[in-house]
Amino acid sequence: MNSKLLYRIGIVAMSAMLIVAFYLALVFYPVLVESAEEDIDVIFRALFPLISVFIAPVAGLVLYLRKKPAGLTLCAGYAIFMTAASVFSIGLTGFNVANVLTVILYLASAVVYLLPQSRFSFDPDSSPVDNALNSLMWAVLLVFIVIGPVLLPARYIGMIVGLVVLLLVLRGFVGLKK
């Protein structure tokens, strides 16, 4: 595979995640409004996951469009994490299938990290915008993993699976940088 094809695969993967996020918002908005009339806590339990579903693909897509392959890794890690959490809490749905497809697209383009321009952390040559977006993605992933189990107790197993996958991804990149 050449780098242009890998780049296109990455854009398709994150665009798919963004479409899934909009679909999710449309499906769950009426349910949230109805549930909030009975219990306002429902909004707080659902708000963070819904916001993070939007932030992950947007920040990842912007990073990737700026030729920063780290955006694809972070989005894929998030997709794996959300898929595991969703499967354990609500079973197999269209949302989970979309996440699985995103992960498959990511795996197909994993060799992009062998390219010289790959960056996974702060880079003195990068613009402040690139570094800020990279940090934002890490914040979304880490905060969701830490706060997620408190807000959504049914997803403990998914959180653990997501954290393990994230640690494996980190370990892989530490190995690549040496």
For the regions a language model picked out, list residue spans one by one:
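Topology signature of small-to-medium multi-pass alpha-helical membrane proteins
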Residues: M1-K178
